[in-house]
Amino acid sequence: VIKAQVLAGGRGKGGGVKIVETLDEAKAFASKLIGSFLITAQTGKKGIQVNKVLVAEAIDIKKKLYLAISIDRSTSKITIISSTEGGTEIEEVSAKTPHKILKEQINPLLGVLNFQARQIALNLGLTGSLATKGSSLIKNLFKIFIENDCSLLEINPLVLTPDDELVVLDIKMDIDDNAIFRQKEL
């Protein structure tokens, strides 16, 4: 899989992601991308220039999920957003099937409580040992969110493989501009 590395979402729909079968296909697509301007719903009409690509191994996917942590502007609270409809733009899911998006507010002083992590995992359709793995992932993501002064940490998609493994295929991380001085290495 060849993925354009730009600071914008919607790369797949914008033509910035392609599954290739051969080395020649990979070279051709990467050459086409590098130096081009990728236009997505988040970039505006001018697009963003692609200077790098990521080459990743393709994996078999059983189910695509969505998981994000953000600051809910209407409540000014940290919120975990989850959906069984991963791999597409969450705005689309919200418009067409809002009942498939679940939100859980988190107290920053307490962090993600065990019952909250478990409930989010269950809402994602994870059961048994997968719910345990999902709960652990959720708690670890929250820790990353707090430690790095994030305003958004979005996994789309989080995939379930046929072997029942959870794999983060794409992640977006936005750092709060007011805290960037604390995050020099980022």
Label each residue range with its predicted role.
Residues V1-R11, T40-I61, L67, L141-F145, ...:
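ATP-grasp fold ATP-binding core
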Residues I2-S31, Y66, E89-I90, E154, ...:
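Glycine-rich phosphate-binding loop of ATP-grasp-fold ATP-dependent ligases
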Residues A4-V6, A68-R73, I80-S83, P157-V159, ...:
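Short beta-strand elements
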Residues L23-T43, I120:
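Catalytic core of tubulin tyrosine ligase-like
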Residues S36, T88-I90, I175-N178:
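A short local loop/turn or secondary-structure capping micro-motif enriched for an aromatic residue
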Residues G44-Q105:
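Hydrophobic alpha-helical hairpins/lids featuring a short glycine-rich hinge
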Residues Q105-V168, K172-I175:
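Glycine-rich, mobile lid/loop segments that gate access to catalytic sites or pores
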Residues D177-L186:
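Conformationally flexible catalytic loops at phosphate/diphosphate-handling active centers
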